[in-house]
Amino acid sequence: MDVCILTSLEYGDHLLNSCMDECERLGGDVWVEIDGLPDAGTNDDTLYISFLGDYIVPKNHLKKHMYNTHPGPPGYRGWGARLRTLQDNKKQHAVTLHQIDEGVDTGPIIKTEYFPVDELSTTDSIHAQAEVHCLRMVRWLITQYKEGKKIVPSGEQWSGRPMLKKTYIEQLK
């Protein structure tokens, strides 16, 4: 199966390179689209993975095999999950793998992976951990596809209002 990685990372980024390596295990072509979709549009025969990307997929391009690695827990949709984890004095953070739908972090949740946060954690350290966990989610997803396993929602639900990028940047000031 071919894989298209939708991302905001730059070519040469070690995380993007690792993500590409994982996707190559499916045996098809792997390509990267930075902050957008392929010029040819989308198709039902390709696996699309939004890996640390900021792009919102338009409704007319949504496909069955389209997933997002959200670097935050289901309660912190959109931007700034790591900042909200610190503001709310949480003891753990998470990354969430979900199917992409027309909302911002609203698609069926496939898997959530939690990790501890302590008093020494910063937004940068939490994000660095989240990036690694997002890569683990890609590895898991590729393994499921490679082994022919059905991808099913976990039953976990999204909550909270999404934070916009503009709001996140304002709160960092």
PLM regions and their residue ranges:
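One-carbon transfer enzymes
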Residues: 1-173
